[in-house]
Structures are given as structure tokens and as C-alpha cells.
């Protein structure tokens, strides 16, 4: 009996442990729940040990539908009967959150609000009611709303009673993450002030992701998309700048670690997902609106000492409240006022008129990225503040214009629409100026690093005696500097092409020119190795591997950038295929001075490797696809033994042959199109002639047939035109020997 009772008590204690939180900092440790952060693998709570585990499949990231979240809960907890999901009330801190498609998981903590996976039949949460606090609840059977709605209802109800919302829970589920009521606990302000301060301190020390990006405005959504795309591009450039080139063997790992912090920051600012709650974001908007209102005494004449938040000063100030009416920027104490509106201070304090100008006037330095981020935040804060002010003015104007004529209302709406559009355009211009300035500074930094790397490389070559390993290390740094410039250019063009194809078409020639300069500069720098054949032969394999590794990434992007979209001329079968177009452009650059093969590794060094036909002939181009060619084996050394005149002849010959290739290619298309046009004209002429001939034949046949009918006569018979059809028919019958029996009968009687 006693062992059985012990087992029952143990089972009951285990079931209770699954419901009661054990650690407020880590969330509901033993309760089934999932957490998501876009760009990283989903996490779920291990109900056995209270720790967060990564996605079992290693592939799934943030989910944007409540149905999908419920299904995912059922997948990660197959042994539990998951019937519904609901957003948690408090955020949780998760360590070592793995990025998607990356093995390393050591990152700084992330704070997100998880989803609770509800097991079995719904049971409302048991709320603790501290001393001096009140337990309240609201139910509406005609309403089925989300967790966010009922949280707002509970908070406003507590605010009306001059109390703070301490805790709350959902009641009466009516759908996935939808309910018909809420239970909550309201506590006096003094009881909650410590909780508010500690929560603010925790948020200030952590990177909290609330599941949304910066506030969008309807008229500027497109500019926002462009800005986000450009910021992502700048992020990629800054990641490259953070690379540590000193470690030659483990450079890739160092670069990956350097990219980690900014990639996470980009994800937090640009990821838009519905996997975490928007409760706090909505509350922040309400707080910002409340704290931006002017203090109102109200219609009553009492003299009650209260506090309000002064936006211009960034602090709370006293005023006298009349006792009724007014607005919500009305607090009993200064501490409570600052606890509520303190979060508004950074936004308003940063929005100085010259916030962006300071960045533009300050020269770039090693902390360029940090300065750019601060300038961007100040710009967005200023824009949000100005838009909020316009929206408040618009709302007030609409209230005052309710009784005005329809034409006046329309004029008011048009005025504020134009004002909003003007602000959006101004903000877009400032963003563009900010990004362009940052891009220019990044390019300048890349140029400086490349110049320094080239100087070190040349110095290593000129050393007596030259050290092959040192030369290779300097060459490796120089090649990486060039490749960073190349990748930066390609990524910039890719982003521009995605957000503004017209602008991409305009800058395409500039991008191609810049890439040609990079290719030529690299070829000239690599040819310096030929001056020292011993060093070149010793590091040949390493250089081959270096160039192949550095070029693999950029070739695909370059091929996509160079390829033009096909244009239909009414007969696509006559146009060259996309593969042919890509191959032609890759093999025949714009000015014929280089090709992608010029950057491939070489396999021969020294003066003996110069081709015998250098003066009169250019090596034929391999027309196979790049994937089939592999590493080129054409010699690239011996340039030091070729005279300047010979180099000029080779370059001119190459230009002539490449240019000729372009001419022939286009002439074939033109002549082919002309042949097709002439064939179409001949076909049309033949068709018209055929129609005319057919018409003549038909008319001739009709006339012949008519003539045949009219020419059949057995004698001359005069027919009165006035006779009836019956008489005419009888006459024809008589012509053919027909005799009317009636007439014959009467003739016989007469005879």
C-alpha cells in the first residue's frame, strides 16, 4: 500500500512540476514551449532537463503563422497532446543560439518571447495575488481576440484604477492563440516600481528582439525596402572589413567570427517575422504617444499636484490637475512618470536637427561602422518623431473638421497627405546621402588597404634575397584586398539590381570598367612574380590554390551580372540561348583586353615558357563552359623578356580579334534578322498573290457554270414573261415530250 501511494505522490509531483515555473530568468523551464529568431534555428524547451534544445532537423527557422507554430509544437513534442499555443507573458534569455547552415553556436545571449505549447484541455493559469493587489477578470463571449488584445485590455483596466498590471492569463480559448477573456492582477504603483526599474535595466543590457523592424509608414514603404537592402549591403562590406588577415592559415574562421556580431545586429533590425509577440512594440508606441501629449488641466477646477512628461526637456515636470478630463500624460509621482516615459528619452534626445550633419562633417576613421550605425539611428529617431507629430496634427485636424463641408475635409486630407509625402521624401534623401557617404568611406578604406598590401608585396619581392614564404604571404594579403574590392563592387551591383533595375542598368558600364581595372591591376601585380623565377616556381602550387579559392565565389556573381536579359523580337527561336550569351560575354569582354581566364592560376614560369607565336598570334580561346575547362595551362610567365613593342602588338592583336568577334557575332544576328524579314515579306507577297489567283479561278468557274446552264436548249420556244411559274414549268415539260393526259382525253372525244 505504501509503495503504491509513494508512486502516486511522485507522479502528482512530476505533473505539477511541468506546470510551475522554476526559474524566472529562463522562462517556464519545464513547460513545453518554442522560441524563434529569424536567421537562426528554432529552439524548444526540453521538458526533461529544463534546457533549450535546437531544432531536431537542423533546418527550420522562424514560422510566420499560428497554425504553423501549433504544428511545429506537435512535431517537437510528439509524445504530448498539444492542442493550442499562446504567447508567453515574459521574455526568456537563450544562450548559444545556432545560426542556420553554420556549425558554430557561440554567440551572445538573445532575449525573445517564446510560444507556450498548451497540453490537453485548456486550463487557465494560476495567478499569484500579492498583498494590496487585486485579482480581476473580463470575459466577452461575442469577442475572439489574440493575446495582444487581452493584454492591452488588462493593462488599460489597471491604468484606469491607477495601478500597474502585475500578471495576467488568458481565459476561454476560441481558436489558435485566440481567447474570449483575460484574468489579471493589478498592484499599486509603489509595489511595481521596483519591477519596472529592474526590467528596464535588464532590457538596456541585452539585445532584445521583439519580432519587428522599425516603424513603417505607408507612403515610404518602398524607400524603406531600398534602405534595408542597402544597409544589408553595407553590413556585408563591414563584415569583410572585420577580417583578420594576419592569420594566413585560419583566415576564413577569423573572418566568420568577425562577421558574427554585425550579422546578428542586421538580423535584429531587418528581420520581420510574426513568431514573437508584438505586445511590447505596441505598448512602446502607446507609451510614446501618451508621453508626447501636452499636460491638460481638464474642465474641473481642483488643484491636484501631478506630474507629466515634457518631451522637449526629456524629463518629468509638475503641474496642477483639475480633477477630471485631461489626458493620460498624468502621473501621481515623478518616479512613476519617469518609469513609464523614461524609454522616450533616447528617442527625443537623439533627434537633434544636426544629428546626421555631424556624421557627414566628421571624417571617416577605423570606427566608421559604429559612427554610421549611430547616425542611422539618429536619423530614424528624428523621422519617427516628425511623423508622429504630423500624425497627431492630422488626427486633431480631422476631429475639428467633422462639421466642415466635404470640400474642406478633402482639402485637409490632401494637405496632410502632401506633408507626409514630403517628410518621407526628405527622409529617403537623407538616408540615401547617409548610405552613399558611408559607401564612399568604405571604398576609400579598401583602397588604402589594397595600396598598403601592394607596397608590402613589392617590398618582399625586392628583398635580397627574397623569401618565398614571405612573398606568398604578402601576395595573399594583396589578392584578398583586391578580392574584397571586387566582392564589394559585385554585391553593391547585385543590391542595386534587386531594388532598382533602372539604376543598375545605368551603372552597369561603370561597374564593368571598375572590374576591368581590378583584373588588369591583378594581372600586372601577378606578373611581377616572373621577375623572380625561383620564387615563382617554389610557390606555384600555393598561388594556384589561392587564386582558385578566391575566384570561385565571384565568378558566378559576375556571370549573372554580365548576362543581359533576353529580349523578344517576336521569334525567340531565332535568338541565341542564354547559355550562349553568357559564354560569349565571358569569353569576349567589352574592350577585349582581358577575360576571366586571365586571373586563373598558371603552371609554367621562366623565360622558356614564352609561346613562340606571341608576336603574330593570340592563343585561341577555349570555348568550353567554365566548369569543364578546369585550370588553364597556358603560360603566363616570360613577360619580363618581351619587349614593349611586342606587348603592344599582342594587346592590339587581341583587341582586334576580340572586337572582330563582337562584330561577327552581331552581324550574324543582323543578317539573320534581315533574312527572316525578307522571308516574311516574300511569304506575305505569295499569300496575297495566291488569294488573287484563287479569286480569279472561283469567278471563272462560276461564270463557266452559269454559261453552261444557259446554253442547254432543244429548240426555240418563246415564253411569255407574264406566265406563272406553273405554266413555265409545263412549257419545259412539253419541250421534253410530255403530254398532258387530260388534254389527250379531250382531243380523243373531239375526234
UniProtKB/Swiss-Prot annotation:
Stretch list, region CuBD subdomain: 131-189
Q: Which Gene3D superfamilies match?
A: Amyloid precursor protein, E2 domain, Amyloidogenic glycoprotein, amyloid-beta peptide, Amyloidogenic glycoprotein, copper-binding domain, Amyloidogenic glycoprotein, heparin-binding domain, Pancreatic trypsin inhibitor Kunitz domain, Pleckstrin-homology domain (PH domain)/Phosphotyrosine-binding domain (PTB)
Binding residues for Zn(2+) 2, per the UniProt record?
Answer: 658, 662, 665-666
Q: PTM details?
A: Proteolytically processed under normal cellular conditions. Cleavage either by alpha-secretase, beta-secretase or theta-secretase leads to generation and extracellular release of soluble APP peptides, S-APP-alpha and S-APP-beta, and the retention of corresponding membrane-anchored C-terminal fragments, C80, C83 and C99. Subsequent processing of C80 and C83 by gamma-secretase yields P3 peptides. This is the major secretory pathway and is non-amyloidogenic.
- What are the residue boundaries of the E1 domain, all occurrences included? 28-189
SUPFAM superfamilies documented for this protein: A heparin-binding domain, Amyloid beta a4 protein copper binding domain (domain 2), BPTI-like, CAPPD, an extracellular domain of amyloid beta A4 protein
Hydrolase keyword on record: no
Q: Belongs to which family?
A: Belongs to the APP family.
* UniProt name for this protein: Amyloid-beta precursor protein
From the broadest rank down, the organism's phylogenetic lineage runs:
Eukaryota, Metazoa, Chordata, Craniata, Vertebrata
